From Swiss-Prot:
Pathway annotation from the record: Amino-acid biosynthesis; L-histidine biosynthesis; L-histidine from 5-phospho-alpha-D-ribose 1-diphosphate: step 4/9
GO molecular function: 1-(5-phosphoribosyl)-5-[(5-phosphoribosylamino)methylideneamino]imidazole-4-carboxamide isomerase activity
Organism: Bacillus cereus (strain G9842)
Localisation per UniProt entry: Cytoplasm
Protein's name in the database: 1-(5-phosphoribosyl)-5-[(5-phosphoribosylamino)methylideneamino] imidazole-4-carboxamide isomerase
Recorded name of the encoding gene: hisA
Pfam families the record matches: His_biosynth
Record-stated family: Belongs to the HisA/HisF family.
InterPro entries listed in its UniProt record: Aldolase_TIM, His_biosynth, HisA_bact_arch, Isoase_HisA-like, Isoase_HisA-like_bact, RibuloseP-bd_barrel
Length: 239
């Protein structure tokens, strides 16, 4: 199982939100580059970065920070948030980003998604963020009428190989992942699933591992030391 330490960027800082609400932010580190280096030194094998400002604006507003992180660490970096054109995808890949996560664009611009998947194959990941079972977009501000299961099936049919699934109600709560929704998703599609939102303990990670979930994104639990990164990496290697 892959462990993805999370770095959420807002106004150039590393922050955490509560249930996706931008008014409920906590600054975890004023220097995201330093935070990335910390995670790498603790043994992280890949980083998950979200440009929160970009998710709302529809374009990367923390690009320079992302570029600095890519230059500062030797491990792969995957990035999401506001990536809605091929030019934006290419720009990120050109500075060393390993994989790009498309969210809003996956729902509203299928032709762009298809072209991106055709050109970049497994480097394109789709992020499905759900609230009460329905897909949320534009930085979680808009709620669509499409279920997360329906969108996941569409993405699989278009050749997407990996999905990041986030239950917004769990994000930043340390209340545990939404195992029920993840189980339904797993039964509905046959592609890689990365779980995000609510992970609070090594027990949560073990349960996801037992479910054969491909990866898990961990944010608040690492920053608040509910989970020790070195320990969870060791545990997942032994499983």
């Amino acid at each position: 199982m892959e462990i993805f330490p999370a770095i959420d960027l807002k106004e150039g800082r590393c922050v955490r939100l509560y249930q996706g609400e931008f008014s409920k932010e906590t600054v975890m580190n004023e220097d995201p580059v330093a935070q990335a280096i910390i995670f790498e030194k603790l043994g992280a094998e890949i980083l998950h970065i979200v440009d929160l400002d970009g998710a709302i604006a529809g374009e990367s507003l923390n690009f320079l920070v992302i570029e600095k992180i890519c230059k500062a660490v030797r491990i792969p970096v995957q990035v999401g948030g506001g990536i809605r054109s091929l030019k934006a995808v290419e720009k990120l890949l050109s500075v060393g980003v390993e994989k790009v996560i498309l969210g809003t664009a996956a729902l509203y611009d299928k032709s762009f998604l298809e072209e991106a998947v055709h050109l970049y194959k497994e480097k394109i990941i789709v992020g499905i963020d759900a609230k009460n079972g329905f897909v949320a977009t534009r930085g979680w501000l808009d709620l669509s009428e499409i279920s997360y299961i329906s969108l996941a099936k569409q993405m699989e049919s278009l050749g997407v190989q990996t999905i990041v699934f986030t239950d917004i109600s769990k994000d930043g709560t340390l209340a545990g992942p939404n195992f029920e929704q993840l189980t339904l998703l797993q039964k509905s599609v046959g592609i890689r699933l990365i779980a995000s939102g609510g992970v609070a303990s090594i027990q949560d990670v073990k349960k996801l591992n037992d479910m054969n979930i491909y990866g898990v994104i961990i944010g608040k639990a690492l920053y608040e030391k509910k989970i020790d990164l070195e320990e969870v990496l060791q545990v997942t290697k032994l499983c």
